[in-house]
UniProtKB/Swiss-Prot annotation:
Protein name from the UniProt record: Reverse gyrase 2
Enzyme nomenclature, EC number: 5.6.2.-
A biological process from GO: DNA topological change
Toprim domain boundaries: 618-783
Region ranges (Topoisomerase I): 614-1215
Subunit structure as annotated in this protein's UniProt entry: Monomer.
Family affiliation: In the N-terminal section; belongs to the DEAD box helicase family. DDVD subfamily. In the C-terminal section; belongs to the type IA topoisomerase family.
Native organism taxonomy: Archaea, Thermoproteota, Thermoprotei, Desulfurococcales, Desulfurococcaceae
Coiled coil: none
Residues annotated as domain Topo IA-type catalytic: 799-1200
Cofactor: Zn(2+); Mg(2+)
Domain of life: Archaea
C-alpha cells in the first residue's frame, strides 16, 4: 500500500496458511499467492470459484462445502415446513450440518422444536442415518411423532406405554429387530428398554429434548453416550478422569499433603492420555440437547464436557415483556382468590414451596367455590395442562418449583396471560444448617458486628482472614458439617463456623422476634415465628422462569403479561425485590399503581400479533478477557457453555428494550492480544520493511509457554526463555473465532475502549471478515446489562486512525527498545536486561530522586502527644535530635486559624487513582491496576484507564439515588466535571457502597466472577467515596496553624481541626481534633519521642511517578503502571515493603547512567514527550505515519552512530 503502515499477518491466510496483507483480509480475500487476481466482490461463492479456477483451492474448500450443505438443508426445510429458516434456526443449522454436538440455549418461540424435528427427518431420510429422539413426556412423544409423520411419512417409530396394545407391540418388534431408522420415545424408555437399543443400534444423531428428564437417572448419561458410538472403555475413562479431577480439587483446597496431590496429578495425566487414545479411535455420532436449563447434580453430566465439549445447565428465560407487581395482605389466600377471580381467564397461580401443596389445594377449593374453574397440576400428569389449554379451566394452579411442570413445561402463549404468585417464590432451610455456609455466616456476622456485638466482630475478622486463603469455600462448609476433614486455613475456618453458628442462631432469633419474628438482611429473611427458626431465600430464577410463561415470542411479537406476588409479609416481597434488582431489570411495584385497563388491552392485542415486531439475531460477542465474558454471560440467567480447544463460549439470550430485537449471544474472549510484531529475522528494521514510501510490519500470533509463562512471537516451536516445547498459540483462538463467525448473523467486537482494545478489535475483525462480513465494533465503558445492550445496538466500526497510531507506537517502541536492549545485553553481558521509550525516563526520575534523598538525609523527630495527636520536626543536626529526645512537653507559641469552604475533588482519573492507591492503600501500580481491572470486568466500576473527569447523566443519577437512600439529598450538588465525550471518570456503576456490596455478594444477591478480597473492597470503597463526594456540596473546614516550641526548637504544624457538612460526610479529609483545643501558652505533654532516619526529599512512590508521567506528557492511562512494572521486572527498581517507596538497585543506577550518557537523545523526557505528541497527531489524522517512522529511524540511527563515535564499541563487556 502506498504510504502508511501495512501489516502483514504471518500464517493467517485462511486458504493456504501463509502470510497475508491486512488489506486482503479486510476485503475478505485470501493472500495474493492464492489469488493474484481477486473477484470484484468477495463472497464465499466467488472466492471459492476463483480459487478453484486458479488451482490453489486449499483449506477454504471445507468452509464452502459447509455452506453448500447448509443450503441443501435449508431447501429441504423450506419444502417440508413451508417456511424459510429463521435467523436462530440458520445458526443452529450450520452447527448441525457440521456434525457438532451441542446444547441449544434459547428463549421459547424461536423454532427449536421445528428445526430439530425437520433435521431429525433429514438425517434419517436424506442422509440415511439412524436417529434417536428423546422427550420427557408421552404427550410430547405423540406430538413429535405426528410432526415427523407430516415431514416424512412412515420414517419414525414411536413408543410410549399408553399406545394401543397392537401399535405398542408393533413398535417394540420393529425396534428389537433393528429395523427402526428414527425412534421417538421418552427418556424413561431409555432406562427401561436399553437392552433393546444396545449394542445393535449406533445412532448417527441423538436429540434430547429437556436434559433434566435425562439426568434424573444419571446412568442415562452413559447410556446416551454408548448409543451415539462411544465405547464402554471410553466412557469409563472419561468418568474416572472426572472423579480424579474432583478428588484433586478437594485435595488442593482442603490442605492435603503434597504426596497425595502429586499422586492424583499423576493419575490424571495417565487418565488424560488414556482418554486421548480412546477418542482418537472413536467415531461417535451427534448429540443435540434442547431446553438445557436447570442445575445438573452429581458428576455424570460432566461426561458431556469431557467427550463432546459442551456443558448442560443454564438458559433461564430472561426475555419477558411483563409488568411486575405485588400485594401485601394478612390473608394471602383470600386476596389471591379475589385477584384471580377479577383477572378472568388465562391465569396461572404459582404457590410458593414454603407454603406447601396443601395451600395449593386450598386456593383451588376457594376458587371453585367462587365459580372459577381450575386445574390443579401438582404432578407431571398432562390432564390439568390440557384442560387449561382447551379453555375448560380458567385457572391453572401448581407449585413455584424451578423444575415444576407449569414452570418449565408450559408453552401456551395464547392462553397464559397472568401469573399470580401465592407467596413470594422461595426456599427455606433450618437456620443453623444455613449458617454452615461461610458466605452467609460472614453476612450475618457483619450485621451483628454493626450492631455492636463484640464476639461477632471478632469472629468476622478471624473468619474473613482465613477465607482469604481458601479458594473453594464449599470445602469449609462440608468440613463444618463434619462431612469432610480439612487442614490448614480451611480447617480453622470450619472450626470457627462450627463454634459460632449456634451462638449466631440465638442472636438472630432474638433480633427477629424483636421485629415480630421476621428479620430481613438484604435478599435473605430469618423467620423465627415458629419453634424452629428458618432462613428463607427468595428464588429469583424461579420467579423469572415462572412469570415468563405469560410472556414469550409469539407471532413475531413478545406477548405482554402481568405478574403479581401476593404475600402476608412485606419482608418476603422486599427480599425478592432485592434479588431481582441485581439479576434483572425487573422492579416490583404496588398493584395499585398499575393501569389495569390499559394493560389488559396490551395483553390481548399482543396475542393477536399487534405490537412491535421482534427480530431475532444470532450474535457473536467478542471481548478480550475471560472474566468480562463470564460477567456478561451471567447478566441474563445461568448461561450455557461449550468448549472448543482452550476457548470457552458462553450462550445466552437478551432482548433490547428499545428496539425489541432479541440477540441469541455466543460470548467468548481472545485472552488478550492475538498478534504482535514478530521477533523473527523478517524485514530490515526489526520486523519492519520500507515499502514504496510506506512500511510493511510483520505480525505473528502470540505464543505462551505453559511452563514458564513467557510470551513470544517467533516461529520457534520452543520457548526462547526456558526451551520448553509446551506452548499455546493464539492462532488457535483465531481459528475458533473463524468457526464461530461462520455460525452467526453478526459479530460485535467489544474489547476495551482504548488503543490496545482497538488493536485487538482490528485483529479480530481481520480474522473473521472472510467468514462473515457483518462485523461491528461495540464499545462500553462499564460492564452492565444496559451498556452491553447499547453496544449490541450500535453500528460503529473500528477506528482506523487509532489502529494506525497503535501500529506506529508499537514500531517506535520496538525500534528504540530493541536498539537500547541489544546494547545493554552486550555491554553488561546480562541477557535479561532491557530498556524502553517510556520505561527509561521513568527510571531516570527514580534514580535522580534517590540521589537527592541521599544528599538531604537527616532525622524525623516524631512527638506522640497526650492530647492524642502527633507532630513532627525534621533536622539534619544530630545534637538537636538528642536534645529533642529529652523534651517532656511542647509549648504553643502562637495560633493562626481560618475557615474555608472547600470543593470536593473530581472523581478519579487513572493517574489520580494510582496516586491515592499508592498513598492511602500502599499498593504498587501493577497491583492497583490489576484490582481496578477486576472491578471493571466484574461490572462494579467504569473503565479504569481514563484521563477524563467527566461524569455522565447516568453517573449523576446514580449518585443522587445513593445520597437519597442515605437521607443526604440536601447535600447533593450534581456536577458533570467535564465536557461531553466517550470517556468517563472512574466511578461505581451501582448506587451501593462498599459495605452493602460486600453483604450483597456474601448473601448471594450479587454474583460476580472473581473472589472479592478485602483489597477489592478497600479499592472499591476509595473509588465509591471519591465519586459520591464529587456530587456533593462543598465542606466547611477549620484550618489551624500552630507555632510550637520544643526546648530551643520552634516549628510549625498545620492541619484541619474541624470539618462540617458537604462532601466530608462521605469522604472526610484527615482531621486533627487536638488542634481545635489549642491556645497560645498551652503546654502539651509529650508521651513519647520517636526518631527515624528521613530526608528533606521523600522518595517517590508509584503514584508520584504516575503524576509526573501525566504532567510531562510521556504516558497514557494504559501505560502508566506498565512503565514502572517493567523497571521492576528488569531488576532496576525495588519497592520498599512498608512505605512502598521506589528505590533503584545498583543495576538500575548503572543502566540509567549508561543510557543517559550514551543515548541521551533517545531516553530524555523531552524526546519521549515529543514522540508522544507526534503519535497523538497520527491518531488525530493530522500527521502521516510514515513521516513519524522515518523521523524516529533517523533519530535511532544517529544515536547509535554517535554512541559508536564516542568510543564505546558494541560487544565490549564491562567485565
Amino acid at each position: 500500500m502506498p504510504g502508511g503502515v501495512n501489516a502483514v499477518y504471518m500464517g493467517l491466510c485462511y486458504n493456504c496458511g501463509g502470510n497475508i496483507d491486512e488489506d486482503r483480509l479486510e476485503k475478505g480475500l485470501p493472500c495474493a499467492r492464492c489469488l493474484p487476481s481477486p473477484p470484484r466482490r468477495a463472497t464465499p461463492l466467488t472466492v471459492y470459484r476463483a480459487l478453484k479456477k486458479a488451482g490453489t483451492l486449499g483449506a477454504y474448500s471445507w468452509e464452502y462445502l459447509s455452506i453448500r450443505e447448509v443450503e441443501r438443508f435449508e431447501a429441504y426445510f423450506a419444502a417440508k415446513s413451508g417456511s424459510r429458516l429463521w435467523s436462530a434456526q440458520r445458526s443452529w443449522a450450520k452447527r448441525l450440518v457440521k456434525g457438532d454436538s451441542f446444547a441449544i440455549i434459547a428463549p421459547t418461540g424461536v423454532g427449536k422444536s421445528t428445526l430439530l424435528t425437520v433435521y431429525a427427518a433429514y438425517v434419517a431420510a436424506v442422509k440415511r442415518g439412524r436417529v434417536l429422539y428423546l422427550v420427557p413426556t408421552e404427550n410430547l412423544v405423540r406430538q413429535v411423532y405426528a410432526k415427523l409423520d407430516q415431514v416424512e411419512p412412515g420414517i419414525a417409530t414411536a413408543y410410549y406405554s399408553r399406545m394401543p396394545a397392537k401399535a405398542r407391540e408393533s413398535s417394540l418388534e420393529k425396534i428389537a429387530s433393528g429395523g427402526a431408522r428414527l425412534i421417538v420415545a421418552t427418556t424413561g424408555f431409555l432406562s427401561r428398554r436399553f437392552d433393546l437399543l444396545h449394542p445393535q443400534y449406533k445412532f448417527d444423531l441423538a436429540i434430547v429434548d429437556d436434559v433434566d428428564s435425562l439426568l434424573r437417572n444419571s446412568r442415562n448419561v452413559e447410556r446416551i453416550l454408548l448409543l451415539t458410538g462411544f465405547s464402554e472403555e471410553t466412557v469409563e475413562a472419561a468418568h474416572s478422569l472426572v472423579k480424579a479431577r474432583l478428588k484433586l480439587y478437594r485435595a488442593l483446597h482442603s490442605g492435603a499433603s503434597e504426596s497425595i496431590v502429586s499422586r492424583l496429578e499423576q493419575e490424571i495425566a495417565q487418565l488424560e492420555a488414556r482418554l486421548r487414545l480412546s477418542l482418537s479411535e472413536a467415531s461417535p455420532g451427534q448429540l443435540v440437547i434442547a431446553s438445557a436449563t436447570g442445575r445438573p447434580r452429581g458428576v455424570k453430566h460432566l461426561l458431556f464436557k469431557e467427550l463432546l465439549g459442551f456443558e448442560v445447565g443454564g438458559g433461564s428465560d430472561y426475555l419477558r415483556n411483563i409488568v411486575d407487581a405485588y400485594v401485601v395482605d394478612s390473608d394471602p389466600v383470600g386476596r389471591t382468590a379475589e385477584i384471580v377471580s377479577a383477572l378472568g381467564d388465562g391465569v396461572i397461580v404459582f404457590v410458593s414451596q414454603r407454603l406447601g401443596k396443601d395451600v395449593a389445594r386450598a386456593i383451588a377449593g376457594r376458587l371453585e367455590g367462587m365459580g372459577v374453574s381450575t386445574a390443579l397440576a401438582l404432578t407431571g400428569a398432562r390432564r390439568p395442562v390440557e384442560a387449561f389449554a382447551r379453555g375448560e379451566a380458567r385457572v391453572l394452579i401448581g407449585m413455584a418449583s424451578r423444575y415444576g411442570v407449569i414452570v418449565r413445561g408450559l408453552d401456551l402463549p395464547e392462553r397464559s396471560k397472568y401469573a399470580v404468585f401465592l407467596g413470594a417464590p422461595s426456599a427455606k432451610t433450618h437456620l443453623l444448617e444455613a449458617l454452615y455456609s461461610p458466605r452467609r455466616m460472614l453476612a450475618f456476622l457483619s450485621i451483628a458486628q454493626e450492631k455492636g456485638v463484640e464476639w461477632a466482630g471478632e469472629a468476622f475478622r478471624r473468619l474473613s482472614r482465613l477465607l482469604e486463603k481458601v479458594i473453594d469455600t464449599s470445602i469449609v462448609s462440608l468440613a463444618a458439617r463434619g462431612k469432610l476433614e480439612a487442614q490448614g486455613p480451611a480447617g480453622e475456618a470450619a472450626g470457627i463456623i462450627s463454634e459460632t453458628a449456634p451462638r449466631l442462631v440465638d442472636w438472630l432469633v432474638a433480633e427477629a422476634r424483636l421485629q415480630g419474628g421476621l428479620l430481613r438482611v438484604g435478599g435473605l429473611v430469618v423467620d423465627a415465628r415458629g419453634p424452629i427458626p428458618y432462613l428463607v431465600v427468595p428464588d429469583a430464577p424461579t420467579y423469572i422462569q415462572a412469570s415468563g410463561r405469560v410472556s414469550r415470542l409469539y407471532r413475531g411479537v413478545m406477548t405482554r403479561g402481568l405478574s403479581i406476588v401476593v404475600d402476608e409479609a412485606p419482608e418476603y416481597v422486599e427480599a425478592l425485590g432485592e434479588r431481582l434488582k441485581w439479576t434483572t431489570s425487573s422492579r416490583l411495584r404496588p398493584l395499585s399503581e398499575v393501569d389495569m385497563e390499559k394493560l389488559r388491552r396490551e395483553i390481548e392485542e399482543s396475542r393477536r400479533g399487534k405490537g412491535r415486531r421482534v427480530r431475532v439475531k444470532t450474535t457473536l460477542l467478542v471481548v478480550e478477557s475471560p472474566t468480562k465474558a463470564r460477567t456478561i454471560a451471567w447478566f441474563w440467567g445461568r448461561p450455557g457453555k461449550r468448549r472448543i480447544g482452550r476457548s470457552v463460549i458462553y450462550e445466552a439470550s437478551v432482548s433490547d428494550p428499545e428496539t425489541g430485537d432479541v440477540h441469541i449471544l455466543q460470548i467468548t474472549s481472545t485472552r488478550g492480544h492475538l498478534t504482535d510484531l514478530t521477533t523473527d529475522s523478517v524485514g530490515s528494521k526489526y520486523g519492519v520493511d520500507e515499502d514504496g514510501g510506506g512500511y510493511r510490519a510483520y505480525y505473528s500470533t502470540i505464543k505462551r509457554c505453559l511452563d514458564c509463562g513467557a510470551q513470544h512471537t517467533s516461529s520457534s516451536p520452543f520457548c526462547p526463555r526456558c526451551g520448553s516445547p509446551r506452548q499455546v498459540d493464539s492462532k488457535s483462538v483465531v481459528e475458533i473465532l473463524r468457526k464461530l463467525a461462520s455460525e452467526v448473523d453478526e459479530i460485535v467486537i467489544a474489547t476495551d475502549p482504548d488503543r490496545e482494545g482497538e488493536k485487538i478489535a482490528w485483529d479480530v475483525f481481520l480474522a473473521v471478515r472472510p467468514y462473515n462480513p457483518n462485523v461491528r465494533r461495540g464499545r462500553f465503558h462499564e460492564v452492565t446489562p444496559r451498556a452491553v445492550i447499547e453496544a449490541l445496538r450500535s453500528g460503529e466500526s473500528v477506528e482506523k486512525s487509532l489502529i494506525e497510531a497503535q501500529k506506529v507506537r508499537r514500531i517506535v517502541d520496538r525500534w528504540i527498545g530493541f536498539h537500547l536492549s541489544t546494547h545493554l545485553k552486550l555491554k553488561f553481558s546480562k541477557p535479561w536486561l532491557g530498556a524502553g521509550r517510556v520505561q527509561t525516563p521513568v527510571l531516570g526520575w527514580i534514580v535522580d530522586r534517590y540521589r537527592e534523598w541521599q544528599d538531604t538525609r537527616g532525622y524525623l523527630v516524631i512527638f506522640k502527644l497526650s492530647s492524642g495527636g502527633r507532630t513532627s520536626y525534621f533536622t539534619q543536626n544530630r545534637l538537636e535530635v538528642e536534645n529533642l529526645k529529652r523534651v517532656e512537653w511542647l509549648e504553643v507559641v502562637d495560633i493562626a486559624g481560618k475557615t474555608e469552604e472547600r470543593n470536593p475533588p473530581p472523581p478519579y482519573t487513572t493517574d489520580e487513582y494510582l496516586y491515592d492507591a499508592s498513598r492511602k492503600l500502599g499498593l504498587s501500580a501493577g497491583l492497583a491496576m490489576k484490582i481496578a481491572q477486576d472491578l471493571f470486568e466484574s461490572g462494579l466500576i467504569t473503565y479504569h484507564r481514563t484521563d477524563s473527569t467527566r461524569v455522565s447523566p447516568t453517573g449523576v443519577k446514580l449518585a443522587l439515588e445513593y445520597l437519597a437512600s442515605r437521607g443526604l439529598e440536601g447535600e447533593a450538588q450534581p456536577r458533570g466535571w467535564g465536557e461531553g465525550g466517550a470517556h468517563e471518570a472512574i466511578r461505581p456503576v451501582r448506587p451501593i457502597d462498599a459495605q452493602d456490596l460486600e453483604r450483597a455478594v456474601l448473601s448471594g444477591s450479587i454474583r460476580i466472577p472473581i473472589r472479592l478480597t478485602r483489597l477489592h473492597i478497600r479499592v472499591y470503597d476509595m473509588i465509591f467515596r471519591r465519586f459520591i463526594a464529587s456530587q456533593m456540596k462543598p465542606a466547611t473546614l477549620d484550618i489551624v496553624e500552630a507555632t510550637l516550641q520544643a526546648g530551643e526548637t520552634v516549628f510549625n504544624h498545620a492541619g484541619v481541626a474541624r470539618v462540617r457538612g458537604g462532601y466530608a460526610l462521605v469522604n472526610p479529609p484527615r482531621v486533627e481534633e487536638w488542634l481545635a483545643r489549642l491556645s497560645p501558652g498551652d503546654r502539651i505533654d509529650v508521651e513519647d519521642v520517636l526518631v527515624v532516619k528521613s530526608s528533606l526529599k521523600r522518595l517517590y512512590r508509584a503514584g508520584d511517578i504516575v503524576k509526573m508521567m501525566r504532567e510531562h506528557g510521556i504516558g497514557r492511562p494504559s501505560t502508566y503502571a506498565k512503565a514502572i512494572e517493567q523497571n521492576r521486572r528488569h531488576g532496576y527498581v525495588i519497592e520498599s515493603k512498608k512505605m512502598r517507596y521506589l528505590i533503584p538497585t545498583k543495576t538500575g543506577v548503572s543502566i540509567y547512567d549508561y543510557l543517559s550518557n550514551g543515548f541521551k537523545k533517545l531516553v530524555s523526557v523531552d524526546t519521549t514527550r515529543r514522540l508522544e505528541e507526534a503519535l497523538e497527531r497520527v491518531e488525530k489524522g493530522v500527521e502521516k505515519p510514515e513521516a513519524v517512522l522515518a523521523s524516529v529511524w533517523r533519530m535511532v540511527d544517529e544515536a547509535v552512530s554517535l554512541h559508536a563515535a564516542t568510543g564505546d564499541v558494541m560487544g565490549q563487556s564491562e567485565a
